[in-house]
Regions:
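Leucine-rich repeat
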Residues: 91-99, 127-134, 154-161, 181-188, ...
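Extracellular leucine-rich repeat
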Residues: 99-116, 125-143, 152-170, 178-198, ...
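Short amphipathic alpha-helical interaction elements and helix-loop-helix interfaces
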Residues: 141, 168, 186, 210, ...
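Recurring C-terminal helix/loop segment of individual leucine-rich repeat
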Residues: 124-127, 148-154, 175-181, 203-209, ...
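Cullin-RING E3 adaptor/co-adaptor recruitment helices
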Residues: 2-132, 139-141, 398, 426, ...
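Short, solvent-exposed loop/turn at the beta-strand->alpha-helix junction
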Residues: 110-120, 140-147, 167-174, 195-202, ...
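Eukaryotic tandem repeat interaction scaffolds
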Residues: 337, 349-353, 495-585
Length: 778
């Protein structure tokens, strides 16, 4: 047996002593930042326990770089305590980690004795691990922990994205803003839901100028008095500070930037910026803004690609100016203006924007809301002239069938528009629209963003078409019952991509059977939402339909009755699903098990699911759902799942996300057992294709070719990637390679029954038999 060096007992004691001293020092530091919350000794005891659970790797420095940081192996330990803050640590991108809220509607810091554990870990992760790139904080932070957070940000060296929510603590926020200015690698700062006094803008402006890497900025709302000279001065100084952000490409804010005192300065910033490509402004009625100066500035900055004016109700002069600027702009690709509402005090005329469509500009997408049907003739005249625009969205009050007829006849003469979407609050002429689309030959090019409500109209529309791609039916307020045969017509829609159904009464057996048949036979349906009561027998049929589905990527189910056989079938369906990545199972009735306390085995075996909400305990708020049926179910189902179950679900999702990242890395060249095992688990599903398309920006056929090539590589180099050999198998003294191309076909026959997880590596300390004729060849 070969000789092995071992640490002397004194060396082990020295290491343990040093680690203990380091933990004591860190515990004292945390206690100093949060006086009165706990004691340094209690914090030390907790950290020492964490160190033990991570095999003494807690104190190890961040190992990010070519290899994965060691915190990837201990996510369960960290999340066991971060969940006390309603937060989680997960691998957001390959090799990059982030801290995210679990339930953003819950305040943080309610139980101080427990929360200090979570805050200690959060502080440590931000201070010591540059692989943590994202921090999205929950809604409210207890003031006792704000110093600790500020200290963590000051000491951080890796954050690229920071999001703050609903911060209202005015005194402590200056420390946080100061700390933000020290984040040397920050690329995205989101303060959209923060509410600040004007005086804090000076500190924020100074901090932003110190971050040379900042690319995306969402500004906070400001509690400003437009008659207060001091407030206006703060806004003006902040606008000047924006010029000190040389890489700022995306800017989002409400219109406090456009008040008369700072409007000219902001327009100057927009005009001169060489990096700004996307500008989003949200109108607030508290401020009187000057849009015209902004529009002129936009016209002089050809780098700008997207302009969003959310909630702006433009007068005729401003609308004409905006349309003229957009028409002459050589870089603008996306324009959004107005807002859609069932009631408005005045409307945007819309004529100038309609004429813009007919001028064949570089604009690829226009979203216009806030007008009436009076501008439909102008749009109908302009659309046939356009040869460049690809998407158009309109939110116009008082649309009816004759207006749609005029519009669709014009759309039929247009070749470039791929999709036109109309925003509606509700509509009762579904069948008429279906007939018009068929008559004008515009199938697949029109979408109406509203639910169908009338049962008879719903059935007629389904019957008179076979090319619908999206169906949303909500009969909660309708007096009549849905005709039992209505859903049967869905079987003829071979291009159906999205289906959403809500009913006021338990679904009838015939309807359930039709839906089940659709689910089990469709190859096109990707998203399905079912929100209706279902008896045990109806639920059984529906679950059987789901079990036969091979296309859904997004599934949401509410109010079904799931007995033991159906529950078993449901979990088995999830085990075998290779397409489903988003799952919502809420307020289901499990008569045999009123409370879920462990994650079912079938669900645990699913490696494709990335987002899930399963039997989460609802809040007692009566307005969580908007009809009596939902409140009845809420009362019936008091407790739906235990914290252990919910933690298990989150663990599964984190595991699957990391598995997907390892598989992506395998396809892009990373090698080793960890990567090969992950690739083998998810290579047959659609999630890997989508992840690679996002990572590599390549077409789907090329991505599938990459996956096929990686599969062939793994087949050929299985023994190496599984860790059996280093490079090849050598037999005897001749050095001849035993496994070569000669027996490759035979090897493939064996390989089809063999997975990476079937190979059990020799535990550390056990040596190979010296009499073995095989040896490792590098």
């Amino acid at each position: 047996m070969p000789f092995r060096l071992r640490k002397r007992p004194s060396e082990q004691i020295t290491t343990a002593t040093k680690n203990g001293e380091k933990l004591h020092q860190y515990a004292a530091c945390v206690n100093q930042q949060c006086p009165g919350v706990s004691t340094a000794e209690d914090i030390f005891s907790f950290l020492d326990a964490v160190d033990g659970r991570t095999n003494a790797e807690f104190l190890a420095p961040c190992s990010a770089g070519p290899r994965l940081c060691h915190i990837a192996d201990h996510l369960s330990v960290y999340n066991d305590f971060l969940q006390l803050l309603d937060m989680e640590l997960k691998e957001d991108k390959p090799g990059e980690f982030g801290l995210f809220p679990l339930k953003v509607h819950y305040p943080v810091g309610a139980d101080q004795r427990s929360c200090i554990k979570g805050w200690s870990l959060l502080h440590w992760l931000l201070r010591e691990h540059c692989c943590v790139k994202t921090l999205i904080l929950p809604w409210l932070i207890d003031s006792k922990y704000q110093r600790l957070l500020s200290d963590a940000l000051h000491l951080n060296s890796g954050l690229k994205k920071l999001t703050l929510h609903n911060w209202q603590a005015k005194r402590a926020f200056k420390d946080i803003i100061s700390a933000i200015g020290t984040l040397a690698q920050l690329e995205e700062l989101d303060m959209e839901l923060v509410y600040l006094p004007p005086s804090a803008l000076g500190c924020l402006g100074t901090a932003l100028q110190r971050i040379s890497t900042l690319k995306t900025l969402k500004l906070p709302s400001v509690d400003m008095d437009v008659c207060n000279a001091s407030h206006l001065s703060c806004i003006t100084q902040f606008v000047k500070a924006l010029k000190g952000c040389p890489k700022l490409a995306v800017l989002s804010s409400d219109n406090f930037l456009l008040v008369p005192a700072s409007g000219e300065g902001f327009a100057e910033f927009v005009m001169e910026s060489s990096s700004l490509t996307k500008l989003s402004l949200c109108h607030s009625p508290r401020y009187h803004s000057k849009e015209c100066a902004l529009f002129m500035a936009v016209g002089k900055n050809n780098n700008l690609e997207e302009l969003c004016l959310d909630g702006f109700m433009l007068y005729e002069e401003a609308e004409r100016l905006l349309a003229e600027v957009a028409a002459q702009h050589t870089g603008l690709r996306y324009l959004e203006v107005g807002f859609y509402d069932g009631f408005r005090e005045w409307e945007i005329n819309g004529t100038a924007l309609a004429n813009l469509v007919g001028r064949n500009t570089g604009l690829r997408e226009l979203v216009f809301s806030g007008g009436t049907v009076s501008c439909i003739p102008e749009f109908a005249e302009a659309i046939p002239k356009n040869a460049t625009m690809q998407k158009l969205t309109l939110g116009l009050l008082d649309m009816d069938v004759p207006n749609y007829r005029v519009f669709l006849q014009a759309l039929a003469r247009n070749q470039s528009l791929q999709l036109v979407t109309f925003k509606e609050s509700s509509y009762y002429y579904f069948n008429d629209i279906v007939l018009l689309v068929r008559e004008t030959g515009t199938e697949g090019r029109l979408a109406i963003d509203a639910d169908v409500h009338d049962p008879q109209d719903f059935e007629k529309g389904l019957k008179n078409s076979t090319s619908l791609t999206r169906v949303a039916y909500s009969n909660r307020e309708a007096a009549g019952l849905t005709p039992p045969g209505a859903f049967r017509h869905l079987l003829h829609h071979r291009c159906l991509h999205e289906l959403r159904i809500g009913l006021p009464r338990p679904i009838e057996m015939e309807s359930a059977t039709s839906l089940a048949l659709l689910l089990s036979t469709t190859s096109s349906l990707r998203c399905a939402t079912f929100e209706f009561l279902a008896t045990a027998s109806s639920s059984r049929i529906l679950v059987e339909g789901l079990a036969g589905n091979r296309s859904l990527t997004d599934l949401s189910v509410s109010f079904w009755t799931i007995e033991a056989p159906e529950a078993d079938l449901l979990w088995r369906m999830l085990r075998s699903s290779r397409t489903l990545k988003t799952l919502t199972l809420e307020l289901l009735d499990f008569p045999q098990s009123p409370m879920l306390d462990r994650v079912p085995e079938g669900l645990l075996q699913n490696h494709y699911l990335l987002r899930a909400a399963i039997q989460r305990n609802p809040t007692p708020s009566l307005d969580m759902y908007h009809d009596g049926i939902h409140r009845q179910v809420l009362k019936k189902l008091n407790v739906l799942s235990t914290p252990t179950f919910q933690f298990g679900v989150q663990e599964l999702l984190r595991r699957n996300l990391s598995t997907l990242h390892r598989a992506v890395q395998f396809v892009t060249g990373s090698r080793g057992r960890r990567y090969a095992e992950a690739f083998e688990r998810v290579s047959k599903g659609s999630t890997l294709v989508e992840a690679l398309k996002k990572a590599l920006a390549e077409p789907e056929d090329k991505i599938k070719g990459r996956i096929a090539s990686s599969s062939r590589y793994l087949d050929e180099h299985f023994l190496v990637e599984a860790g059996v050999v280093r490079a090849a198998v050598v037999c005897g003294e001749s050095g001849r390679v035993q496994l070569d191309r000669i027996g490759f076909d035979n090897w493939l026959c064996i390989r089809q029954y063999l997975k990476v997880t079937d190979i059990v590596l020799t535990p550390v300390g056990l040596l190979a038999d010296p009499s073995s004729s095989g040896s490792l060849q590098d």
